[in-house]
Amino acid sequence: RGWTYKQILLHYYNNPGISLVKDSNLPSKVTYNGKSYSLAEYLGKTAYAEVGPSAPLESIKSQMVAIYTYAKRQNFKMTTSNHAFRESYAGTSSSIENAIKATLGEYLAYYGSPAFTPYFSTAAGKTASSANVWGGSQSSYPYLAGGRTSPEGNVKRTLTISSEELRKKVEAYNAKVDSSKRITLQSNPAQWIKILEHDSARGSSCGYISSMRIGNQTMRGNAFRLNIMGAATLRSHCFTFTYTPD
């Protein structure tokens, strides 16, 4: 669209209380998974893993600001569960290094405090709200209300999993939760999953799932993705499914 990185940021993190601020006290180190990195190293390795060096420069710049903001909110102490990270990246991309220099220390503030800036490389046509993704009250993050158009190319993937494989994933989930959250599957696998509500991000038949039933339990689509399927297996909670009997 020819947007600047500032326009990109204020499009996705959209609220009158959001502003772009320059940090006057940069950290000397950032900790990721127990290891210390210089700020530039951390930004580069994270951006390389998330958007890569071939993305438009303004997009990479906006990514840098989101990364820095996210880390600042975490007091620059991150774990492997926080985000993607490419350890092998060694400062060899001119676009990534230029984006670091152009935005170093810039972050998004919400009425003066670092905003919560989860980031992603692609969306299914528009963004999902924080309430859809994590639950809770939308008032906690009013600048993550969803519905923001996201014009990058969409990636469609097909995942095939047997009923036995899904049963094992449910059993693994049940072993980690208390009895009130354990899933009981019906005898017929065709009845195991039902999508109850989604935001129609891709049309009336597909969107980010805010409510679904698996067995006897109801949960958010992102909870199903993260806690049962695994984030690396099911890459998004914007999905449809079909069941084919053996």
Description of each model-found segment:
Residues 1-246:
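Conserved, single-site charged/polar hotspot
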